[in-house]
Amino acid sequence: MTIASDAWQALADWQPQKLTDLVAADPDARLQALVRNVADIRFDFAKTHLDAAAIAILANLAEAQDFGGRRKTLFSGGIANPTENRAAEHSAERGDGAPESVHAAQALHQRMRMMIDAIEAGAFGEIRHLLHIGIGGSALGPDLLVDALGRHSDRYDVAVVSNVDGAALDEAFAKFSPEHTLVAVASKTFTTTETLLNANSALQWLDEAGVADPVGRFIALTANPGRAMEWGIDETRILPFSETVGGRYSLWSSIGFPAALALGWDAFADLLEGAAEMDRHFRLADGADNICLLAAFADQVYANRLGCQTRAVFAYDERLRLLPAYLQQLEMESNGKSVTLDGAPLAQHSAPVTWGGVGTDAQHAVFQLLHQGTHLVPVEFIVAREPDHLLDDAHHETLVANCIAQGAALMAGRASDDRARAYPGDRPSTTILLDQVSPRSLGALIAFYEHRVFANAVLLGVNPFDQFGVELGKEMAKGLAEGTVDFDPATQALMKAALGD
């Protein structure tokens, strides 16, 4: 057996204690061991089943899987994505990486600032709206940033359109006036079918509205400027980012342009600085002192010792309502793998299903299952100390009290002679407490999740930076639409029923 397989066996043999016993045994020591403050964010793992024995086992696993070496490769611009023979340099966009990559990112950010200056100076006419067209990582990040941080900004109206369903574009067209709209097409390859179809429809919308030089209203955010120029966008209106920045890690690059335009450059710079602070922590902290690695330890306990197939994230803050959807792609597209780095079948469970919602709404929808269902679901709560409104304090006090009470109730449960009213308890939760939802704190929070994903990938021995699993369905959709592939009778019958002959 290898050292890694020994560690996995030790985890299988490890016996978890009841949460209430763990917390009651030595509360001060537990808080010291499982609560961290990084970048003005409090990460509280005290209500998880982690104990000293589990942490020691998983620390041995991290060493066996060369966590230190893979982390160094990540930050030095080495081949962190071996299946595509690429680096993974999203941290360089925040100033932490190979010097040449950091300099390239700084040059890109300067071009972004110049583009914003040009828009504000009227180079594209009187622009009031930005229609951002992308999908996946080219849309989820910008949408999250603008929705979370743009509540008090009146700079520009931004609509992020990702779905190829024409209703999505129709909705944006209804809100915007063509003569005052700029269109950003975001695609790493500039070959994404849905994005280009939406871009062509937006071009037609501008043309039919009588906009002079409609293609001149387009800018491109891409790692393939040649394809963007072939589509018709002038080189001066292309903001190119590096191929070594993965789509779901790209909001720090020109993909984040909608946020920089809508919020202002200072806010975008604060976002980068918050992420950079988390980068420094992840790069320098070792073992369980590293909050991203500690979080991965908890993830592996639940996925590969206690058999949890899902993980729920609930943001008790309306501004973070899009965060669960963002994390779904980040976590499941990164670590939803079944093959290790050396091509062997993965013996452990990979990423669980990530899902969630916003509190307190979710309490009236899904918490029944969390408290009394037969599935054990680790829950993550995210809440801020400071509200973003001027309403009565009772609003925020009630919100925070509900968030904290849910974690306590999941852990403690409640006995009852009436089984229908009994709560089994011993259900784990993590609480992430922000001082406030700001560009800096959101940058740090997103970077925490990125590095947590990477730490989990190291423990599992998988590559978190490829996504070959998304290709087959797209290829088959193309063949089905074009009629160039023979499909099974059931699929042919369904296609005929949906679209006719």
UniProtKB/Swiss-Prot annotation:
SUPFAM superfamilies: SIS domain (SSF53697). It catalyses: alpha-D-glucose 6-phosphate = beta-D-fructose 6-phosphate. This is Glucose-6-phosphate isomerase. GO terms for molecular function: carbohydrate derivative binding; glucose-6-phosphate isomerase activity; monosaccharide binding. The keyword tRNA-binding does not apply. GO terms for biological process: gluconeogenesis; glucose 6-phosphate metabolic process; glycolytic process. The active site is at E333 (proton donor), H364, K474. GO terms for cellular component: cytosol. Residues 78-101 are annotated as: Disordered. It comes from Sphingopyxis alaskensis (strain DSM 13593 / LMG 18877 / RB2256).
